A protein has these predicted regions:
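Short, surface-exposed charged micro-motifs
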Residues: 22-24, 53-55, 109-111
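Compositionally biased, intrinsically disordered linkers/stalks adjacent to structured regions
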Residues: 81-138, 142
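A short, polar/proline- and glycine-enriched secondary-structure boundary/capping micro-motif
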Residues: 44-47, 74-80, 131-135
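Short, surface-exposed coil-to-beta transition loops
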Residues: 18-20, 47-52, 107
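Short helix-loop boundary/capping segments
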Residues: 51-101
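Active-site acidic/histidine clusters and adjacent loop/turn architecture
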Residues: 1, 5-32, 37-41, 116, ...
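Contiguous hydrophobic, core-forming segments of folded domains
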Residues: 27-66
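Short N-terminal helix-initiation segments at or just after the protein's N-terminus
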Residues: 1, 5, 53-65, 127-129, ...
Length: 161
């Protein structure tokens, strides 16, 4: 009916819908790490945001996961888990959800990206803190994870020189 289309038109003309995507990257001679960012606003209280990283071995073109880089993945997982917990505790920030440690323990399933100085783990909004706290990022210098890396990991990250 005409009335229905008038209502539809009134409610959609001024609707501020927005989708944005972005890519950033870091690479050395052996590894390429893409970070994909996405923001979507569909009329709610605030936009939804999301970030994901994907890394590639430049010699093979294959994706690289954290498990590919570790001598003992359980030891690496525990070490990084403890380092993230320490950063949270040292920050004094009280906005984290009360059970954030249950999510942080699965950091390996989050967005993990590399640069020349270390590894960054990203927890998207609502993963471990409310939207108002934003995404939570934790940087860990390579010297703290190097003992847990296998030869392949040391090679890709150019820590074998």
């Amino acid at each position: 009916s005409s009335a229905a289309s008038d209502v539809y038109k009134r409610h959609t003309e001024d609707f501020a819908y927005r989708d944005e995507a972005g890519i950033s990257w870091w690479q050395n001679e052996r590894l390429l790490c893409f970070t994909l960012s996405y923001v979507s606003y569909t009329g709610g209280a605030h936009p939804s945001t999301w970030r994901q990283a994907v890394s590639f071995d430049l010699s093979t073109g294959k994706t690289v996961s954290v498990t590919d880089l570790a001598t003992d993945i359980n030891q690496l997982e525990e070490a990084v888990y403890q380092l993230i917990l320490r950063q949270i505790q040292d920050s004094g920030d009280t906005s984290y959800f009360s059970d954030y440690d249950k999510t942080v323990v699965d950091w390996i399933e989050r967005s993990v990206f590399y640069n020349a100085n270390g590894v960054t783990i990203v927890f998207n909004t609502y993963d471990i803190a409310p939207y108002s706290a934003g995404e939570q990022t934790f940087f860990i210098p390579y010297d703290l994870v190097k003992p847990y890396l296998n030869d392949y990991g040391l090679h890709l990250l150019e820590l074998d020189t």
